[in-house]
Regions:
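Cytoplasmic helix-loop-helix junction between adjacent transmembrane helices
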Residues: 3-43
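Helix-loop-helix hairpin linking two adjacent transmembrane segments in secondary transporters
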Residues: 38, 42-91
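Juxtamembrane intracellular "pre-TM" segments in multi-pass secondary transporters
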Residues: 91-133
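Extracytoplasmic gate region of multi-pass secondary transporters
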Residues: 128-183, 241, 275-276
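Helix-to-loop junctions at the C-terminal end of transmembrane segments
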Residues: 183-195, 283-284
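Cytoplasmic membrane-interface "Motif A"-like loop-to-helix N-cap segments
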Residues: 191-205
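C-terminal ends and interior cores of transmembrane alpha-helices
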Residues: 206-220
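A late C-terminal transmembrane helix in Major Facilitator Superfamily
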Residues: 254-285
Length: 321
């Protein structure tokens, strides 16, 4: 148990650091697409690693499989340490906002000049109401995401009477939809809303509510239609799952992008934990109607929490709330 906890602890270091690099090297009006591509890494890795490690474990034992996974992670980390630089100025380049003539990026670069790291963390993360709104929204989005991932195959088995393999294949469509949805959300927030994540977040949150409602209120006896519903739900869930983290980085101080992303990420995993035992109790008492009611309510409230972000977002500090 201790080793698993340490494994998760060190894995958690990756995302905030990547968020900091993405906010440093890409400007506001292009960041969504690149952030979306980075966000698909866990989908691609989640698909490839079981095949690579599974084959190694089958032929050489489970210890070898785990060592291969760890070895690949170490090699990738060493390569990144060798090739990555913390900011453009390190290699003699101007700040990315100046290079791209991005007004909102320039505003974020100039925000809070001269503050200490403690003042930045306090003002732009811990006491920033917009970060707290995004954190609460992340809890609800992850309730929906983890609920479909954890309970979707059981729902398919009980409602359609299909075997577990067939049920899991439908849940796979949820991940596939999420892969595409994250790319569309990132690209759309750049091209359609000029780097404002609020409108796209709200559109996708409304889509979560509609797609969850289609699974709940219009149950299809056809496996194909159920799989299509899982696909659309994944498409809309993974948009906010990606955009909320990026919005947190952009609503904070540029020097606190990693801290802001890590802070909202903490609440995301709180939401994932709520889809375990608490949701199991809901299913025991109110069955699948209760299950879908809970995640539909979560989707609806998440949409309401995103309403303050409809306007274009410069850095948000406490005194702007």
């Amino acid at each position: 148990a201790l080793l698993w906890a340490l494994n998760a602890f060190f894995q958690g270091w990756g995302a905030p650091v990547c968020a900091r690099l993405l906010t440093t090297w890409y400007s506001r009006n292009e960041r969504g697409g690149w952030w979306a591509i980075w966000n698909t890494a866990h989908n691609v890795g989640g698909a490839l690693i079981p095949m690579v490690v599974g084959a190694a474990a089958l032929h050489y034992g489970w210890r070898t499989g785990m060592m291969i996974a760890g070895g690949l992670a170490i090699l990738a980390g060493l390569f990144l340490c060798w090739r990555l630089r913390d900011r453009p100025q390190t290699v003699g380049l101007p700040e990315v906002g100046d290079w791209r003539h991005d007004e909102m990026e320039i505003a974020q670069q100039q925000e809070g000049a001269g503050l200490t790291r403690k003042e930045i963390l306090t003002k732009y993360v811990l006491l920033n109401p917009y970060i707290w709104l995004l954190s609460l929204c992340y809890v609800l989005v992850y309730v929906v995401r983890a609920a479909i991932n954890d309970w979707g195959n059981l729902y398919m088995s009980e409602t359609l009477g299909v075997d577990l393999v067939t049920a899991n294949s439908a849940v796979t469509m949820f991940e596939l939809g999420g892969f595409i949805g994250a790319l569309v959300a990132g690209w759309g927030s750049d091209k359609l809303f000029n780097g404002n994540r609020g409108p796209m977040n709200l559109i996708f949150a409304a889509g979560i509510l509609l797609s969850v409602g289609s699974l709940w209120l219009m149950p299809f006896a056809s496996y194909v239609m159920q799989a299509a519903c899982f696909f659309t739900t994944g498409f809309f869930v993974f948009g906010p799952q990606m955009l909320i983290g990026m919005a947190a980085a952009e609503c904070s101080h540029k020097e606190a992008a990693g801290a802001a992303t890590g802070f909202v990420g903490l609440f995301a995993y709180l939401g994932a934990s709520l889809s375990g035992w608490p949701l199991a109790r809901v299913i025991d008492v109110w069955h699948w109607s209760g299950f879908f009611a809970v995640i539909a309510i979560a989707a609806g409230i998440s949409a309401l929490l995103l309403l303050p972000f409809l306007n274009a977002q410069a850095p948000r500090a406490l005194n702007e709330a």
